Amino acid sequence: VFFDGIVVHVRGADAKVSPHTIYVALGIDLEGKKELLGLWIAKTEGAKFWLGCLTDLRNRGLEDIFICCVDGLAGFPEAIRTAYPQARVQLCLVHLVRAALRYVATKDAKAVAADLKKIYTSPTVASAEEQLEEFAKVWDAKYPTISKQWKSKWTDMISMFDFPEEIRRATYTTNAIESLNSAIRKFTKNRKQYPSEHSALKLVYMAIREASKRWTRPIKHWKQALNHFAILFPDRMPKDYQA
């Protein structure tokens, strides 16, 4: 399950416009197909808000999650571990790289992105740590914040190394959530603000519904990943599942 947020501007009852975030839960089912699981809107969030979202998913029938890919949102990993104790939490690589590049001059962006890629495409945790240290040696003089942030989030970044390459390719490096965000932005780009939270949710839902018409095939590398899931989590697969 991928969790992500889109910022919108909503006019309140007092006629003041304020930023809200619409949070999207995008699931990959056992057939490897994308599915919208939930939409929520809020001005602020924290562990209590996230636990409410996850409880909503559980009450609507989402029994188990193998992997949760999330942005570095405060309180979210803890809420996931409360609602779905067996789920593995992984910080979204797309967001980590994007956040890092905010600090980088345009002329350095390509080289920095390439060196960051060496970290998250490493075959093991040990080699990833070596690449992170190498990154720090090369770039800390100009951009010390990047390696500092990655080191502070390292625990929730490295769970992917517990899985074989097939699962990593199908999940952590997929552009599923990024392509959905692009579709939403394209659909909503001409709206500067919304008269209510409901209207904002409605337009984002319509954008996702339009995008979902193309969700007819499994994501890349899914068959190989699913076979590994069946081996790693035999007791958590549906009883009628056949590889």
Tell where the protein language model's regions lie, with residue ranges.
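RNase H-like nuclease fold core
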Residues: 1-70, 74, 78, 83-86, ...
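A generic short alpha-helical patch detector that favors 3-5-residue windows
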Residues: 17, 42-46, 68, 89-92, ...
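Acidic/histidine-rich catalytic cores and adjacent linkers
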Residues: 118-243
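Conserved beta-strand -> loop -> alpha-helix junction used to position metal-binding or nucleic-acid-contacting
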Residues: 67-74, 79-115
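Conserved, well-ordered core segments of regulatory domains
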Residues: 1-13, 22, 69, 90-93, ...
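Mobile genetic element proteins and their domesticated derivatives, centered on retroelements
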Residues: 4, 25, 34, 68, ...
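A detector of single, family-specific signature residues
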Residues: 30, 41-44, 50, 58-59, ...
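Amphipathic alpha-helical interaction elements
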Residues: 42, 59, 81, 85, ...
